[in-house]
Swiss-Prot record:
Domain comment as written in the entry: The last Arg residue of the ACP-binding site is essential for the weak association between ACP/AcpP and FabH.
GO cellular component terms attached to this protein's record: cytoplasm
Taxonomy, superkingdom: Bacteria
Designated name of the protein: Beta-ketoacyl-[acyl-carrier-protein] synthase III 2
Gene Ontology MF annotations: 3-oxoacyl-[acyl-carrier-protein] synthase activity; beta-ketoacyl-acyl-carrier-protein synthase III activity
Substrates-to-products reaction catalysed: malonyl-[ACP] + acetyl-CoA + H(+) = 3-oxobutanoyl-[ACP] + CO2 + CoA
Length: 338
């Protein structure tokens, strides 16, 4: 699915993030599993990740990220009448995590629902929010990516425990001046690769003889090959739909899964690695939260300038993929509260 976009211009008005306090270093796993700091860092780029406290669910993390946004950008939540949360670790099947976030941030009464597309979820949620604003069904939308992945993985499994962390990020989207905002979206999925990355659900039906535990399971080799290919393909397609090429990218904001995947994308695009926003060394793979976390951090550091060409790209369970091209508007985002 692709979309090339025109008036009204809709873009990012505010950003926010939250990471739990507990820092889990590679040394933690080196003492428990057959691994080492060097092994993890050299293969993934991850040095540490955050784990949520027992009382920090995905809705709590999402609320705190939204509070961070509201503190940095006073008035940004005014007029928001749609809340979408991308998560694979919801508080419950229902009520939706989005509804709980809305209730905890003064947005009670706003339309609210969750999107579940694993690590691609934030891009899917962005596209849905964009479409609802374009259709006149919403004025402004709060899009949240929030995950407690530490509870979804087996902490004794070296193949997954070392990769994932907890956190939340969010954006408010709405109308921006012409020439700014989202230019294109590319989304897709192929269930043929579904068995390579899955997390058992409460109502899951399995073929006879299939073995699946309660935790996230990943075929790392196959997911890596898929990610390298689709991240590059979807990014090129999104830029093409926007009337651009990858040579026009000022900042790549990718899903934070593995530094090797990001390096491969940069090499393919001829983009210096310094122009890719990365924080997986400190947060690990936070699934649907990774792109908004990276956006919020880069914005706070003043890395994005007015008119910069951004490319957001991700991949995840499904197997799924997504990308979005946008022209950064530093209007509200350049006027955050100190």
């Amino acid at each position: 699915m692709t979309a090339s976009l025109s008036a009204p211009a809709i873009g990012i008005l505010a950003v926010g993030a939250y990471a739990p306090a507990a820092v889990i270093t590679n040394a933690h796993y080196a003492t428990r599993l057959d691994t080492s700091d060097d092994w993890i860092t050299s293969r993934t780029g991850i040095r540490e990740r955050r784990h949520a406290a027992p009382d920090e669910s995905s809705s709590v993390l999402g609320i705190r990220a939204t509070q961070d946004l509201a503190g940095r950008f006073p008035g940004a939540l005014d007029g928001v009448n749609l809340v979408i949360c991308a998560t694979s670790s919801p508080d419950a099947m229902f009520p939706s995590t989005a509804a709980l976030i809305a209730g905890g941030t003064g947005l009670r009464g706003a339309a609210a629902f969750d999107v579940s597309v694993a690590c691609s979820g934030f891009l899917y949620a962005l596209s849905v929010g964009y479409g609802m604003i374009r259709a006149g069904l919403a004025k402004k939308a709060l899009i949240v990516g929030s995950e407690v992945m530490s509870g979804a993985v087996d902490q004794n499994d070296r193949n997954t425990a070392i990769l994932f962390g907890d956190g939340a990020g969010c954006v408010v989207i709405g109308e921006v001046p012409q020439g700014y905002g989202f230019q294109s979206f590319v989304l897709g999925a192929d269930s043929a690769g579904g068995p390579h990355l899955y997390l058992r659900g409460a109502a899951l039906r399995l073929p006879e003889g299939t073995e699946m535990g309660p935790h996230l399971t990943q075929n790392g080799r196959e997911v890596f090959k898929f990610a390298v290919r689709t991240l590059g393909d979807s990014a090129e397609q999104a830029m093409r739909q926007a009337g651009k090429t990858t040579a026009d990218i000022d900042w790549l904001v990718p899903h934070q899964a593995n530094i090797r995947i990001i390096e491969a994308a940069c090499e393919r695009f001829g983009l210096p690695i310094e122009r890719a926003v990365t924080n997986l060394d400190r947060y690990g793979n936070t699934s649907a939260a990774s792109i908004p976390l990276a956006l919020a951090e880069a914005q706070a550091q003043g890395r994005f300038k007015d008119g910069d060409q951004l490319l957001l790209a991700g991949f995840g369970g499904g197997l799924s993929w997504g990308a979005a091209a946008l022209k950064w508007w530093s209007g509200p985002t350049g006027k955050q509260s100190s």
